Structures are given as structure tokens and as C-alpha cells.
Design a protein with these regions (language model features):
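PRPP-associated nucleotide enzymes
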Residues: 1-173
Length: 173
């Protein structure tokens, strides 16, 4: 098994990814659902650029994931936070996250919006088709395809990614 490749992005990189997304949108959207936590910042940037003011959030967990992985099954999502159906019904809704890895989280949110009567489209900065659990399914909009673990600039000062950055070679100025 190959080691996971990491890619550390700057704020300028994120700006370029957002700029790449904007001309792709074929429809106007009435609402946006930002998936916590990864979709908050790119979703906010997109909402500002697109003039979307009806902004909602969704938080999803897969609590039984370890047991399910051992059995090679998919865990059911637990929605920790989700907008009421009345806020989604009949609305063209853009669902935003930072990355489509396995696709479980954004697919769960998209399906729940559809069940509520909304008209969802999915949008991510990075699409990883190599981890995708949903066959040929892919985000409606994405900036880049990757096989790397992406470290966004809002993630670099905390958690496990801090150790990654500490290993980055420093060059004399």
C-alpha cells in the first residue's frame, strides 16, 4: 500500500479554486447548505460571490463506521444538525463541502434535501474518484481531481495536520 500523498494549500490556492468553480454554475440557486466543518469556508466564499443569502448548515456523523468497515458494510448517517424541510422544499439548493472523498457525507445530505422536496446540486473544491464509494457518481461541480489528502489553510494550525506541517522542510531565506 502506497503512503498517502499530502497537499498543503494556501489561501491563494483556495481563491483560485473558487474562481475556477464560479463560471461552471449553470443555474441560479435559492439556497446553500454548507456541510460542517469542511464546507463552511468555501461555502461562505461561494455564497458571497454568488449573492446567495439563504445559507443553511448540515452536520453528519457516521457513528458505527469502525464496526461497519470491519464487516465491509456502509454505516448509516446520523444527522446531528439539518435544516427543516420547509426551508428546503422547492428551493434550488447548492450543497457545498471541501472534498468528495468517499462521497458518503455529501450524498447523504443531497438525498435528504431531495426527500424534503428541495432540488440539490453538489459542489466541492476537490473530488477524489479513487476513494469514491458511489461508482460513477460525482459532484455536480468541482474545481480539481486529486488522489491526495488535502490540507486547507484553515486546518493547518491544529490537530494531526500540525505534525505534518512540522515535518515540512524549511529552507533558509
Amino acid at each position: 500500500m502506497q503512503p498517502v500523498r499530502h497537499e498543503v494549500l494556501t489561501w491563494a490556492d483556495v481563491d483560485r479554486l473558487i474562481d475556477y468553480l464560479l463560471p461552471q454554475f449553470e443555474n441560479e440557486y435559492d439556497a446553500m447548505v454548507l456541510i460542517t466543518r469542511g464546507g463552511i469556508i468555501p461555502g461562505g466564499m461561494l455564497a458571497e460571490a454568488m449573492g446567495i443569502t439563504h445559507i443553511l448548515t448540515a452536520a453528519v456523523d457516521f457513528p458505527a463506521q469502525l464496526e461497519m468497515e470491519r464487516a465491509r458494510l456502509m454505516a448509516w448517517p446520523k444527522f446531528i444538525q439539518f435544516p427543516e424541510d420547509s426551508l428546503l422544499s422547492g428551493r434550488r439548493t447548492l450543497v457545498v463541502d471541501d472534498v468528495w472523498g468517499s462521497g458518503r457525507t455529501i450524498t447523504s445530505v443531497r438525498n435528504r434535501i431531495s426527500t424534503a422536496g428541495g432540488l440539490p446540486a453538489t459542489c466541492v473544491l476537490h473530488f477524489n474518484p479513487y476513494r469514491n464509494l458511489f461508482g460513477n457518481a460525482r459532484p455536480d461541480y468541482y474545481s480539481a481531481i486529486t488522489d491526495a489528502h488535502i490540507v486547507y489553510p484553515w486546518e493547518i494550525d491544529r490537530g494531526a495536520d500540525r505534525a505534518l506541517l512540522d515535518r515540512t522542510p524549511q529552507f533558509p531565506s
